[in-house]
């Protein structure tokens, strides 16, 4: 049976065990106490007899209470059960009647003067108590040794059971332990003890089943996917197979596995390694505050450096070519603009020259025409005057002129 702790106000624990059967024969004192119906004898009897009251097997008592006399009550009161259920019911009636009428005043009933002289060594003089308290494992004997070291009588008196105590008001059947003589039932109880602990840790049954299913699946997967160490030679073969298939993006685990043809290598190994190879190849640069890089093997480190260096060089060359191309285009555009500007300047200069030459020619032609017209007019006038004179001279010659008289001065 499971032990039930009963907590009192004095922080004393009450435990019950079913593994210690009582085989002690009842003493004459215990028989006399069990047969008596006088309730006042509970306080008038010595404490040793009261102790045997609880430890007697003749009346079917709960068992013996392992307590001390010189140092007060023990902190742990152990109850051992009996086999017969009828004896338990018989003692329950007698003990409940006797326990109800205990005095409520602890100070007056349990003073230092009223204690009997043989109370201090009752566990040594009474052989029944010694036989009941000595157990095979020696646990209770050690408790007696610890109890003898204490001498606080007031604390011992405060922990006596009175009628005002809530423990007395409860039913004694709760304090009695029901045991069965069948060994199969005991085995079942011992097997069922750790079940409450499992329920406390994992309340739901579905949660309890999950670890079992996961472990079975993990074991199955472990048999199919065993861990494998990738050596540099295996990695080189893997890289060659990936390159032969057209790169890491086009390569498939099945194709790589066929090309490698390594004994013990499965598709799961190739798949995981291919995924790691892809992530290592296209891994972004770590930030300043980011996590440190994963340690790579020398071969992977070299390949990653080569890839990074090649990518950097090609990117730089591509950018340089683009810049040079843009510069050439800009120079060509500037050259064309300069040529057009020069042509336009030449054309304008020619237009200005033509305009100037046309103005000069126009003025010269007008002046020449005027001079020519004047000369022609003069010539025509001269030509007209000359014939008139000639004709007059001719007429004068032809006609006779009269003789003029000479005048004498």
Curated annotation (Swiss-Prot):
It is found in: Nucleus. Induction: Only moderately up-regulated by Pi starvation. One of its GO terms (cellular component) is nucleus. Residues 222-282 form the HTH myb-type domain. SUPFAM superfamilies: Homeodomain-like. Signal peptide: none annotated. Residues 192-224 have a biased composition (Low complexity). This is Protein PHOSPHATE STARVATION RESPONSE 1. It comes from Arabidopsis thaliana.
């Amino acid at each position: 049976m499971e032990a039930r702790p009963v907590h009192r106000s004095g922080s004393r624990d009450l435990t019950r065990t079913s593994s210690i059967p009582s085989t002690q024969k009842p003493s004459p004192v215990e028989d006399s106490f069990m047969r008596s119906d006088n309730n006042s004898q509970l306080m008038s009897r010595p404490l040793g007899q009261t102790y045997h009251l609880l430890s007697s097997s003749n009346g079917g008592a709960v068992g013996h209470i392992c307590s001390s006399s010189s140092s007060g009550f023990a902190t742990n009161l152990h109850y051992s059960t009996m086999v017969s259920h009828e004896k338990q019911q018989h003692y329950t009636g007698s003990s409940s009647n006797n326990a109800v009428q205990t005095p409520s005043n602890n100070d007056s009933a349990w003073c230092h003067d009223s204690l009997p002289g043989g109370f201090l060594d009752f566990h040594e003089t009474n052989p029944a108590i010694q036989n009941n308290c000595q157990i095979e494992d020696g646990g209770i004997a050690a408790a007696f040794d610890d109890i003898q070291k204490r001498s606080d009588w007031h604390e011992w008196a405060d922990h006596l059971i009175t009628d005002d105590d809530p423990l007395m008001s409860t039913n004694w059947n709760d304090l009695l332990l029901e045991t069965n003589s069948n060994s199969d039932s005991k085995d079942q109880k011992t097997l069922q003890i750790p079940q409450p602990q499992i329920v406390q840790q994992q309340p739901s049954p579905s949660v309890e089943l999950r670890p079992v299913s996961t472990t079975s699946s993990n074991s199955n997967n472990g048999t199919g996917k065993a861990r494998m160490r990738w050596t540099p030679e295996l990695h080189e073969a893997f890289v060659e197979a990936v390159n032969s298939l057209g790169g890491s993006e086009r390569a498939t685990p099945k194709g790589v596995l066929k090309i490698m043809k390594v004994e013990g290598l499965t598709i799961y190994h190739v798949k995981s390694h291919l995924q790691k190879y892809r992530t290592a190849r296209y891994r972004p640069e770590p930030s300043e505050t980011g996590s440190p890089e994963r340690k790579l093997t020398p071969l992977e480190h070299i390949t990653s450096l080569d890839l990074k260096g090649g990518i950097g060089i090609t990117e730089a060359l591509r950018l340089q070519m683009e810049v040079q191309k843009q510069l050439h285009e800009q120079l060509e555009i500037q050259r064309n603009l300069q040529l057009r500007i020069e042509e336009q300047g030449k054309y304008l200069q020619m237009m200005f020259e033509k305009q100037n030459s046309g103005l000069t020619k126009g003025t010269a032609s007008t002046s020449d025409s005027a001079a020519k017209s004047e000369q022609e007019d003069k010539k025509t006038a001269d030509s007209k005057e000359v014939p008139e004179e000639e004709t007059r001279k001719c007429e004068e010659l032809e006609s006779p002129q009269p003789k003029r008289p000479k005048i004498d001065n």
